[in-house]
Amino acid sequence: VNSSAPERRRQLLRISLQAVVADLSGGSHTAADLPGGAWLVDGATLWVRLDDAPHRALGAAIAIALREEVDRVEVLVGDPDPAPLVARRASQWSLPISVRGLDGRSPFPVEPVGHRAPPTVPDSHLDLVETIVAAGAEPVVAHGVLTAQYRGLEIAKVVDDDGAPRLDVGVGVNDREAFRELHAGEAPEASLARVVEAVSAHRVDGARPHPFNTMSPEGYLAWRLRDDPSALGVGSLVTTPGAVAPVGAVDPGPVMMLGGGRLFACTTGFDLGALPDALDAREVAVVAGVIDDASLTVVVPARNRLPVIDRMASAAAAEVRVVEVP
C-alpha cells in the first residue's frame, strides 16, 4: 500500500532524527511523531526534529519534554531560515533548550535572531480604511498589512494589484480566489459588506458549528473580551500584533491584547504553539515599554483549560498567569 506524502514526510523526519542521535550518542532509538516534527528520548534528553512552522512546533516539543520529565531539550531544525527564530524562542523558557540547524546529518550551532521592526503600511493602502469601516468591518494593521476583520475573523486583505491597492475579499486564500471570479467588477465596499452579512449570522454565541465560527476561535474570544473587558479586570482592551506574522489568515495562533498596563494572550487551550507565540510577543512589549506589568496573562475558555497549559506556563522564564473566562 502506498503511503501518503505527509506520512512519507513524517517517516523521513523520524529516520533523520534517529540517524542524527545515533551519530551523536550511539545506540538505537525509535522516534515518534509530534505536530510539525519527530521526537525521541535519549537518557534525560529529549531530541526533537522540527519541520513545519518550527517556531510554533516548539510548543509541542516543550509539552512533551514536561510530560517525559527530561532535563534538557535538543532541537534540530532542517530549514536554516526559521532556525534563528526558534533559537530566540527557546531562550524564553526555564527548561534548558539547545537549537541547532542541520547540514545533512551534521548539526551546527544557531544564533538567536533579534526582534525586527515591522514594516509600515503604505499610505495608499490606508486610504481603504474608510471603505472597510463603511462595510461594517474592523480595519486592523499588523506586520505591514491592512486587513478587514469581523468579530476576530479576517475577511479581507489589502494587496497591491499592478501598483494600485486592492481589497482582496474572502476568508482565506481559496475563498478569495473564488470570490474574485464570482464577483468580478463589484465595488469593494459592496463585496466586503456581502461577506460581513454572511459571517455575522454565524459568528455569535450559541450558533451551530460552521466554518465561519470554527475558524479563528481565538479572534472571537478576543472580540468578546474587548466588547466586555470586565472579565479580565480592566477598563478597556486593544489588540496588538504578535512578534511575527501569522502563518496564514485562518491558522491557529493567540490574539494578543493590551489593557491596564498588562499583556493578554487569548487562545483556545488546544494550541500548543500559542505560548511560544505569546512569550515572544511579551518580549517585544517589554522592550517597547508598552506594559507596566512584565508578566503574561494567558486567557482560555474555562471548558478548555487543559493541564498542559498550566504545566507550560510554569516552565516559562517569565511569569505567566492562566485565567479562565466563560
How does the language model describe each region?
Residues 1-326:
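Charged, terminal alpha-helix-loop-beta segments
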